[in-house]
Structures are given as C-alpha cells and as structure tokens.
C-alpha cells in the first residue's frame, strides 16, 4: 500500500535495473547524529566512499510525505539544516507522516522497510538497536529487531551498550540470523560483535560468505 508513496531516485533506479550494487543509508544520523554542517559533510562523504568502491548510495528519508530511496544533495542539506525539527520515523510513524505530508528521518527500521520496497538488499549503518540491559523489567527493546525478523535486508552490527545474551534470546523469538559484518575482507560468525572487545557468545551457524 505504501509503495505508491515511494520515490526512487534516477541514479538508484538505473543501478537496480542494471544489477549494480546499491547500499541503503539511514537519515537519522543526518538530522539527529551531529550538528550542521558536519552532519551534511559526513553524509556526503559516506556517499562518496560508497561510489568510490563501485556501489551506488541510497540515503533514505521521508520528505513531504514521500518515501525517498536516494536523496539529492539538496535534500540531504535540507534534512541537515532542519536537524531535530525532523522527527525520527519508525514503522508506526509512517502512515501519519505520509498522510500529513510531513518529513521524517528514517531509523534502521524504516530504512530497511523502504530499502526493501525499492529492491535494495544491503544497508549500512553505525549500528542497529537491540535489547537494552535490564530489558527483562523495562521492555526496552528496539523496533529494529522486529523488522529484522520480517524484512530481508542485510544490515550490520549491534551497538556496544546492548545486552548480548538478551539480544540472542530475542533473535530466536523473531527468527532472524545474526550472521556477519561485511566491512572486512573476511567473514566470521562472531563478526556481529565487532564493536565488543571480549565476549563469550557464539552464534548457531559458522558460515563463510564470499559476497554480500
């Protein structure tokens, strides 16, 4: 139903049609991650790095009620200048933002959703949300994990502040596989925990993958 509100940039659309690699990028880092103009400079540098490595970047956001897969430099600057005035958009927020014609900075959850709608299979981010320490009493569990269980988009790595044992338990509930981080030239079943220096947790599958 939301597909009719989806705008795929010409660059991204042509890359997908030609079978070129496309990498989705979130937009909360632009609006909420750092101040202007560093946020815009960082976003543009990330896109530049992706292009230099042979792929096409697709920064994802909601602008005036449209689901954007691939932003122009002007749209990135628009989000960067607006900053915290742009609300973070999770799955529950999409219908409201679309109906009101509002802007939204896409979290991991909505970036995955829109990437999948556009046909993008790989998503790069600083880290997904997860199960926070003490969640057995607070229920502080990120919507990112529910999305991982239902949206077939590859995304890398949890952040360090989370509870690894609770996260792995929750992964069984939503039925997703924690597999790898694709930032290096080797792949290992423990790479999900790349930002955690020491850990004693192991995943169920030890599979090596030649290509993302």
List where the protein language model places each region.
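A glycine-rich phosphate/pyrophosphate-binding beta-strand-loop-alpha-helix module
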Residues: 32-34, 60-77, 112-113, 117-118, ...
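Glycine-rich nucleotide/cofactor/substrate-binding loop typically near the N-terminus or early
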Residues: 14, 27, 32-34, 39-97
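Short, basic, glycine/proline-bearing loop/turn elements
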Residues: 1, 90-101, 151-158
């Amino acid at each position: 139903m939301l597909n009719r509100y989806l705008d795929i940039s010409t660059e991204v659309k042509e890359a997908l049609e030609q079978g070129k690699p496309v990498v989705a990028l979130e937009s909360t880092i632009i609006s909420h991650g750092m101040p202007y103009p560093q946020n815009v400079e960082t976003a543009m540098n990330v896109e530049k790095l992706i292009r230099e490595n042979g792929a096409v970047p697709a920064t994802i956001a909601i602008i005036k009620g449209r689901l954007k897969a691939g932003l122009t430099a002007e749209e990135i600057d628009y989000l960067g200048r607006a900053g915290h005035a742009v609300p973070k958009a999770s799955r529950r927020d999409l219908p409201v933002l679309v109906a009101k014609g509002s802007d939204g900075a896409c979290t991991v959850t909505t970036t995955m959703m829109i990437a999948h709608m556009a046909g993008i299979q790989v998503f790069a981010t600083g880290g997904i949300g997860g199960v926070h320490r003490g969640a057995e009493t607070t229920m502080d569990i990120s919507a990112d994990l529910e999305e991982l269980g239902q949206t077939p988009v590859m995304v890398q790595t949890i952040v360090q502040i989370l509870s690894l044992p609770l996260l792995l338990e929750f992964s069984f509930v939503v039925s997703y596989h924690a597999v790898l981080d694709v930032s290096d030239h080797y792949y290992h079943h423990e790479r999900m925990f790349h930002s955690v220096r020491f850990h004693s947790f192991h995943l169920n599958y030890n599979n090596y993958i030649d290509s993302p």
